[in-house]
């Protein structure tokens, strides 16, 4: 069982990660990066987005550490962070893995006032 603070951090980080994965363009970008490093210009050709929109998506993917970037001259190259991608995969598995059941004893039942006729 997680303490309140650990719970918030664990699920908060997982929620940010899944939010980053919750866009079809970002999923497509990640699938392209599965095959290796890509220049932003190559991504632009395939995703059919404007340059500012691609930059927005890449910022989100980089902030969640799913993607790393490096600049070479005027070009930016992006790569899939396989360690972080593996953690995302594990987070999804953990979410649906059978766990210790939560107590079904409802506290409000014991706090109810007795019913009167």
Task: Go through each PLM region and give its residues.
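Intrinsically disordered, low-complexity regulatory regions of eukaryotic regulatory proteins
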Residues: 21-22, 70, 115
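Beta-hairpin "wing" of winged helix-turn-helix
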Residues: 62-72, 79
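N-terminal helix-turn-helix DNA-binding core of bacterial DNA-binding proteins
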Residues: 12-53, 76-85
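Amphipathic alpha-helical dimerization/coiled-coil segments
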Residues: 1-13, 82-117
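Alpha-helical interaction segments
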Residues: 7-9, 46-47, 65-69, 86
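Alpha-helical residues within the helix-turn-helix
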Residues: 45, 56, 62-63
